[in-house]
Amino acid sequence: MLLYPAIDLMDGQVVRLQRGEAAKKTIYSTDPVAIAKHWEAAGADWIHLVDLDAAFEGKSRNLEVIRAIVAAVSVPCELGGGMRDAASIEAGLATCVRRVIIGTKAAEPGFLAMASATFGPDRLAVGIDAKEGKVAVKGWIETMELTALELAREAVDIGIRTIIYTDIATDGMLQGPNIVAMREMAAAVQCDLIASGGVSGPDDIRELATVPGIHGVIIGRALYEGRMPENLRSILE
């Protein structure tokens, strides 16, 4: 089980949202590079970066900060938020992150196949955000009829190896992950599945680690509110 501390960026600051709502924003730090180095020292396997400005507005204000984070840490980084065309994917990869996460556009017919052919499936992950099992897009503002399981199968068929699955109802709420949904997804697709949303403490991570097929977990608000041990690796020992 790999640990992915999350750094959500808005206007160059580290923030957390509740259920993805920009109005429910908490600013945790004005120094994202220091935060990334702190999580690396704590035992992060990856750093999970989200460009919220790009996600909500389609335009990034954080690329220089992201580039600085990647340069400052030795663990790999991944970047999500606003990956809606080839140019934005190229700009994201130009920050030297290991891979970018395609969310909204993954549900558009043909887009994933194009991105995979252009950039290679190893440089891409698919972020599937779900409300009651249905795919949510455009910063979680719209919900589609497409189910999360259907989209996951399509992505794997194209050659995508990493899927990040977020249950929106639990995200940022510190009430525990949706284990049932995570089990369903892990059983449905053969890929590196990363669970996201709702982790409230070490016990949630230990429970996710018992689910076959879950490769990693993204930890957000619980980290910033002191609910995790200083040594993150000790959770799984």
What does each model-found stretch correspond to?
Residues 8, 39, 47, 92, ...:
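Conserved, mostly hydrophobic/aromatic
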Residues 70-99, 111, 180-217:
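Catalytic cores of alpha/beta
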Residues 28-40, 84-90, 144-154, 205:
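Short, acidic/polar
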Residues 12, 19-23, 90, 97-171:
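Conserved anion-binding
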Residues 2-6, 46, 74-78, 98-101, ...:
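Structural preference for beta-strand elements that scaffold enzyme active sites
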Residues 46-64, 104, 165-175:
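Glycine-rich, proline-tolerant flexible connector loops at the mouths of alpha/beta enzymes
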